[in-house]
């Protein structure tokens, strides 16, 4: 398999000769993303170089999780994995569909008409229904993770923080503005409902044009939430396990919930009704993704015959494993092999020589700790 190496934004970027016209799109903490032209499919694609994927055991595990999720989760409203390869410098490259913009950029450019907010919200909840049915929590929903093309098709991306529901889960996930209160209150146990809260914040932002809860810090974020929907009910407060957090909550002045319709008085009443069912302190009372698709606000697009769920739950058996980074590395390479094996059988895009090159690359790598 032949590679072309270039330097983009100060980073070595290696692609197979299959991809031409490589141009930078964005640089983040976990990767450099470029646009390119796939000379086989004759489609524009996005290529993400995962930065230092084997720098530590934790990072290697995160890399494995994202690769495995992208491979497994297949839905019209999720970003699709087109190709994956390992470069000579042993970096991981993920090739996905290329969409022209994201919701964050749209919201910065001009106010969003309600009909567009409605269509985007339907697609977001349709994608979440599928994700949640697979036993996956996205955990980092925000406008910049919702990609949109010129046809207004929306696709959820960035599954680097996605997790299974666990008895104890870390609290520092999701951009603050879209973070569910149970994450701030307990930092331990939560479920798919955190994505529903984030989706509600996104809907509110589409309707208002600005973030609903633009907290300056963790405490200010919680204060803004209580100022809008009132103090958390007793049954929620009783679930707080941190003494410091409980003290902060108890010290907050009493706030009565405000009627959201007074804040969104010029907006669609049905949109506000959906918001009220999403932005609830008690996660057990929030509307689910599947239920939201049946809500009157999304009724114009609702089609129960075309809102699929996952065929099976995602396999999280690896999640509790504490392995050295070289073991994760080997597992990632195995996933790459498996992906190309499936692609070779289904599409014919990958030649026998290409597949042999991947296999040879894996065989030649030594997976002992150095």
From Swiss-Prot:
GO molecular function, one term: protein serine kinase activity
Motif TXY: positions: 170-172
Catalytic activity: L-seryl-[protein] + ATP = O-phospho-L-seryl-[protein] + ADP + H(+); L-threonyl-[protein] + ATP = O-phospho-L-threonyl-[protein] + ADP + H(+)
Record-linked Pfam families: Pkinase
Protein's UniProt keywords contain rRNA-binding: no
Residues the record lists as binding ATP: 25-33, 48
Modification(s) after translation: Dually phosphorylated on Thr-170 and Tyr-172, which activates the enzyme.
Location of the active site: 140 (proton acceptor)
Residues bearing the modification Phosphotyrosine: 172
PANTHER family for this protein: MITOGEN-ACTIVATED PROTEIN KINASE
Homology family: Belongs to the protein kinase superfamily. Ser/Thr protein kinase family. MAP kinase subfamily. HOG1 sub-subfamily.
Domain notes: The TXY motif contains the threonine and tyrosine residues whose phosphorylation activates the MAP kinases.
Function in brief: Mitogen-activated protein kinase required for growth on media where sorbitol or mannitol is the sole carbon source.
Protein name: Mitogen-activated protein kinase mpkC
Organism of derivation: Aspergillus terreus (strain NIH 2624 / FGSC A1156)
Lineage of origin: Eukaryota, Fungi, Dikarya, Ascomycota, Pezizomycotina
Annotated gene: mpkC
């Amino acid at each position: 398999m032949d590679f072309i190496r270039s330097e983009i934004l100060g980073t070595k970027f290696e692609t197979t000769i299959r991809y031409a016209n490589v141009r930078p799109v964005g640089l983040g903490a976990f990767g450099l993303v470029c646009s390119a032209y796939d000379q086989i499919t004759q489609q524009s694609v996005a290529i993400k170089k995962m930065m230092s994927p084997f720098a530590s055991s934790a990072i290697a595990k995160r890399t494995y999780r994202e690769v495995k999720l992208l491979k497994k989760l297949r839905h019209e409203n999720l970003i699709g994995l087109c190709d994956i390869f390992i470069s000579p410098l042993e970096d991981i490259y993920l090739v996905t569909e290329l969409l022209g913009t994201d919701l964050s950029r749209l919201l910065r450019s001009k106010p969003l008409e309600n009909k567009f907010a409605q269509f985007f919200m339907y697609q977001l909840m349709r994608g979440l229904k599928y994700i949640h049915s697979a036993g996956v929590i996205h955990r980092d929903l925000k406008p910049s993770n919702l990609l949109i093309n010129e046809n207004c098709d929306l696709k959820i991306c960035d599954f680097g923080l996605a997790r299974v529901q666990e008895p104890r889960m870390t609290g520092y996930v999701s951009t603050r503005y879209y973070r569910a209160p149970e994450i701030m209150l307990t930092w331990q146990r939560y479920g798919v409902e955190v994505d529903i809260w984030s989706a509600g914040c996104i809907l509110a932002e589409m309707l208002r044009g600005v973030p609903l809860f633009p907290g300056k810090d963790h405490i200010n974020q919680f204060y803004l939430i209580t100022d809008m929907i009132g103090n958390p009910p007793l049954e929620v407060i009783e679930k707080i396990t941190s003494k410091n957090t409980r003290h902060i909550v108890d010290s907050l002045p009493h706030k009565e919930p405000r009627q959201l319709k007074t804040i969104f008085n010029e907006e669609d009443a049905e949109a506000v009704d959906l918001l009220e069912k999403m932005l609830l302190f008690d996660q057990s009372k929030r509307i689910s993704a599947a239920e939201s698709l049946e809500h009157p606000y999304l009724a114009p697009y609702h089609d129960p015959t075309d809102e699929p769920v996952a065929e099976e739950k995602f396999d999280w058996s690896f999640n509790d494993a504490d392995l050295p980074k070289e073991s994760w590395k080997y597992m990632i390479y195995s996933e790459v092999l498996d992906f190309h094996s499936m692609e070779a059988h289904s599409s014919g895009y990958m030649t026998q020589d290409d597949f042999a090159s991947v296999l040879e690359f894996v065989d030649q790598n030594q997976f002992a700790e150095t």
